[in-house]
Amino acid sequence: MNSHMLKSYCLVIFSALLLSLSCRRSRSEATLPSKPGKQDMEEVNRYLVRKDREVILNYIERKNLKMTESPTGLWYMVKEQGTGDYLKDNDHIIMDFECSLLDGTLCYSSSEQGPKDIIIGRSDIEPGMNEGLKLLRRGAEAIFILPPFLAYGLVGDGKKIPPRSTIVYNVRISP
């Protein structure tokens, strides 16, 4: 093998080696986790909603309740129909209530705090409660189960309702 061929052969080997090394990711690049994207967050959210629903269904079965699920995920059972028209936005009501966690821990009640004075759609209440009240009439009694996304969400209320809690309301609307 002459020296010219040997140089060419070495140059080809060196070029191939250099090319293969330059195309490789560095070890630190290959192991860095990516930031969660919108799709990842949506997948996590769907998973949490499914898990919350399973827990609620288990509670309903244990308590032998005959509840209905609304399209938004609110669970409700009207125990007493009440009279008149269904409640709507801007209706003023007085409501007796008990608010508890699925494990039975009582968080709030009208016997401790007095009845709630509410203007539907305008008072500072949970989205699920606002929705549920519109399913009732004056004098009605009902049970609402609010999954976290219709209640206090990821953070809870900062007082008695922990983060990501499903809450159960027993309510009675004054006639």
Give a label for each model feature.
Residues 6, 23-175:
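Cross-family detector of peptidyl-prolyl cis-trans isomerase
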Residues 1-21:
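Sec-dependent bacterial lipoprotein signal peptides
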